[in-house]
Amino acid sequence: MAKVRAALDRITDPSVKAVLNEEAYSHIRPVLRESLTNNPYAIAPDAADTLEKYGIATNPFAVKVHSHGAVKSIENTLLERVGFNLPKEPCTFLFLKRSKLRYLRRGPSNNDIFINLAIEPRDLQRYEEDTLVESWTRITTRYAYISDTFHFFTRKMLADLFFHNPALDVLYATLVLPPEALHKHPSIEPDLYTINYNFNGFQYIPGNHGGGSYSHEFKQLEWLKVGHLKSPELCLTFQMIESIGANHLFMITRGIKITPRVRTFTKDSYVLFPQIFHPRNLNPSKPFPKVKAMQLFTYVKSVKNPTERDIYAKIRQLIKTSELSDYHPDEIVHIVNYFVFISKLDSINSYSDILSLPIWSKALLPIKTKITQLWEKLTGARAFNQLLDALQWKTFTYPLEVVDSPQPLQTRDCFIEDERLEIDTLEDEIPPNPNDNTSMSPQSIEEAVKNNPDLPWAPWLLILQAHNADCTEKQYDPENNLILPIQEINTLPKHQHPDIPTDLLTLLTKLHREPTTVSLDNHRARAYGSDVKNLRIGALLKKQSKDWLASFALKTENIEREVLMSVIHGAGGSGKSHAIQTWMRSLNRRDRHVTIILPTTDLRNDWTNKVPNLEQANFKTFEKALCQPCGKIIVFDDYSKLPQGYIEAFLAINQNVILAILTGDSKQSFHHESNEDAYTATLEPSIITYQPFCRYYLNITHRNKPDLANKLGVYSCSSGTTSFTMSSQALKGMPILSPSIMKKTALGEMGQKSMTYAGCQGLTTKAVQILLDTNTPLCSSNVIYTALSRAVDHIHFINTGPNSTDFWEKLDSTPYLKTFLDCVREEKMNEIIAAEEPPTPVQAPTTHFPKVNPTTVIESYVHDLPEKHDREIFSETHGHSNAIQTDNPVVQLFPHQQAKDETLYWATIEARLQCTSSEENLKEFHLKHDIGDILFLNYKQAMNLPQDPIPFNPDLWTLCRQEIENTYLKKSAAALVNAATRQSPDFDSHAIALFLKSQWVKKTEKIGCLKIKAGQTIAAFMQQTVMIYGTMARYMRKFRNQYCPRKIFVNCETTPADFNSFILDEWNFNRTCFSNDFTAFDQSQDGSILQFEVIKAKFHNIPEDVIEGYIQIKTHAKIFLGTLSIMRLSGEGPTFDANTEANIAYTHTKFNIPCDAAQVYAGDDMSIDYVASVKPSFNMIEHLMKLKGKPVFNTQTQGDFAEFCGWTISPKGIIKKPEKMNMSIELQKNINKFHEVKRSYALDHAFAYQLGDELHELYNENEAEHHQLATRSLILAGQATALDILDYGLRDLK
């Protein structure tokens, strides 16, 4: 597999990788779908890993929560195993709910029998009432199954069960008994279940949830050992078929058969230490994990003179915090004493070797050895023999030897001979309603009118009540007109069909929606058929074969057909589909005589969620419904959004349809055909065609509050008020409705949930945002009505244009928007309440890390280092570079790049810089305008910048200029004198003085690198240029800090305490995080990044001459070799800010990043606590950008956390990577500079040091060793006070 993986890693072609990913996904998708059958739960990662060990997959996208979902998935898996073993003939199920049949892969056709005896009170609500019996009844099938109750049986009960049911041959039984309970040990699978021992028994607790626990007696554990059960009349044989954790599946058959002699529940992974102390009770007595025992043994033998405290610290390091409760303090004390003892014993063989002895000594050696052994028996064994005896660990095992019943059992008659359980089949019917009437009687109408004489709709009150609407008060629209809940009444004949289900017909009659006969319009069907045949419309239909298209058009050519229809019109939120969905929820899962046709995938998903009992094949999008068989009853939901002529064409080709139910709203938007050449584009909307066949329009809503609904002319059955707000910016977490598809697409690409005004039909949400722009006046009243009726509680208007009379003219353009004008203006600000002071954090308990041998740690780095010149860069002109210095192996681990190194200087120029011409740079700049625009739109959305350009503030610009000048003047006089040349007005404003940066390379991945790589350049611009564009960067930084979202942290002008506070408050450690490792970040910032910077500067209204000057220096920058290509240079002035903002723009252009994802940025460094998917649009522009990023993923588990700016991001806060810290200290020691940096190192190290015992949850063994060495070095250097004080204020973060 390693060679296959290596071959795949060598593939770099993106198209080939895409094919491989698609192929892999095609295999992954069915596995994930199948896993939801037995394990539909959201499982904790550790429990999911345990389940995977047992072959049970967990869908990482599952969101269903269960208190002990992992154990439930085991139960379901065993049920599936039982179902595979059972024959297709009828079987008897004892103590099993009928709903569990789906896990057994069985259905009603198997005619299975259910017998459930109510033994405890909760059995009455656990099992179906028709399966409960007061006493046992006869089992007449050959196979039976007892579900998770068998452990409560006695042996005699089981013998009686077989004796009195001669037809029963095979009994499958599942029982829940943890084998470790035989030894009173803690759970061997603590991620799945735990065990309490008390009251002379034990409690099995699944998922650590006490509410689902079972109390057991120790005698019940004997079932795990039973091999044969004998009585005078029969003999039963037991065989364990499957064992997963504490759940076991047994097969019990008649007769004496062979069964395995040993039952294995788990592999042997524990050992018992020998009894080396007296008295015996002062020795370790409980099993200890063998892996941890070996780790402790090798530790005490690898460290010189380990102390008792060191061994305690090592044990604490090896045992997870979550596992500490499984150990007793006295047992830990005995284990420590055991290892202290063997640490003092000599492990060097003290006996004579035979290789160095002469021949006569070899002949006498056995005699000498025998005498020595006799002497040691008298005086005591040598230290080496003592060690070997002390290491005779005994393997502890949980497997059991099976036993037979100790004595024959006497059976007794405990079954009823003359009774047999009768299983009644449930009929699909709606429970009777006390107010249910098949029609409105004259008496009921008369009574309603009498009780409500002032209501014009009093005769309709019973029908309104059937829609859960209590319309007994009057409501008025803004013009003070009375709003009628029932409108557009049509008197129509009532027709029936004998095949329509009675309960459905009763429901329609109750709602006064009886079917009526409708003649199909041949012209509409023919127009749709022609458009489909000639590929003018459709997406899926265009992929059908020519024969299918021709056949479809022929079937729609001439139709003369009448169909029963129930047309249901009503306002948004009136519950048009609610009654139909309620009826459908009473149907059998495999019922196929009803098909629901939906205009959109979102609406289809909504129906499948609301009617989960039917298979998804019953719900079809409209195009797929034409290509697949359908039922005899069709529901066209939101049919106004279906293409014109679709309904007629569908009914023309599906002659089996006996009833069509149409639901829609004549006040909302309808389907618009964008292809003007299509015949269907000239047809009138379907809502108009079928409105005459609707008996009445239900003008009520359960969705909108009265203040909103009444303005729309709709009667509200809800209470409360709607909140209206308006601003020029979008709010987070709310869908946006836009008037155009273009805006909707752009917003969607930036991760914002968006829909068009017309496309939001069917949406119901707590709050919605409505985007107002120049396209709003072009929208029809129906479309505006659709958008305004989506929200339940809050509507936020986004005005992207100037806040002037032009904006209010937009509101005047439609009849609805104007009514909300006053509401927006009168909205009051919520009172701001100061937050309470956070409680003082509790200081972590101190800890002690085990002693580590520093020589051993350093040796792992230096033993593979090649000779100096094999690592250096060689140039024929300048010879070898000089980055590897001194003969000290520790110093040689760290390359030292120096400005005077000519070989490295030219190698850096060749690797980092590329020359071209100013004309090519300008061409590159202008060709990348569109990409720069996309980058800025994503940056603007990510950083929450205002919609309108930011007005220029001269005072703020002056302030930023002063800050830049003050910072520059803080340099020493010598530094200012050295830069005198660049301060001269004669210095070319486009010229760059180039230097090699002197530095020690201390990155963790570069420690001990085998080959020296190119360094970094410093580009020295004219000082006036640096000052101007440094001012520009600082000016825009002020606004970036002002608008920066809470979830984004930019590490600029901040302290480690600020960063630490952000991580603790915002970072999510419950998922994999993501970083972007850029390749040649500075060199890759081409014309697209420059365009982004220019657009960003113009948005901040930076003076035009400053922007033009910036373009000049970026496109005309030159060194002694010629003009440089457009790239980022270190001495520009805005380098750090520009890099950071380019990083943000690129990341948000490439990835779909949710608003709740915490993000950190600094230059080319970044990390996000979420694995974001790549936007489809990025694939279209990726090849046009030089900037490339390689994703790096961290699981955020022990030893695998994200790194950012030299800090490790952990659940306890930020900490320095211990490996880098320790190795940096070693370098400073060996170059005699440690005294200069020890305090700053101590202050950084304090973030980890003060976490104390919590570090065991963060560090792996290697990191713990480096942490111990770094801590020891700093304390010996006198920095204990700095480690405790922590000047950054970690203990009092604000």
UniProtKB/Swiss-Prot annotation:
Reaction(s) the record says it catalyses: RNA(n) + a ribonucleoside 5'-triphosphate = RNA(n+1) + diphosphate; ATP + H2O = ADP + phosphate + H(+)
Every (+)RNA virus helicase ATP-binding domain range: 541-698
UniProt GO BP: DNA-templated transcription; mRNA modification; RNA processing; viral RNA genome replication
SUPFAM superfamilies named in the record: DNA/RNA polymerases (SSF56672), P-loop containing nucleoside triphosphate hydrolases (SSF52540)
CDD domains on file: Alphaflexiviridae_RdRp
Domain ((+)RNA virus helicase C-terminal): residue spans on this chain: 699-832
Coiled-coil ranges per UniProt: none
Domain RdRp catalytic: 1071-1178
UniProt keyword list: ATP-binding, Helicase, Hydrolase, Multifunctional enzyme, Nucleotide-binding, Nucleotidyltransferase, RNA-directed RNA polymerase, Transferase, Viral RNA replication
Residue numbers binding ATP: 570-577
Pfam families per the UniProt record, alphabetical: RdRP_2 (PF00978), Viral_helicase1 (PF01443), Vmethyltransf (PF01660)
Family: Belongs to the potexvirus/carlavirus RNA replication protein family.
Protein task: RNA replication. The central part of this protein possibly functions as an ATP-binding helicase.
Protein name: RNA replication protein
Lineage: Viruses, Riboviria, Orthornavirae, Kitrinoviricota, Alsuviricetes
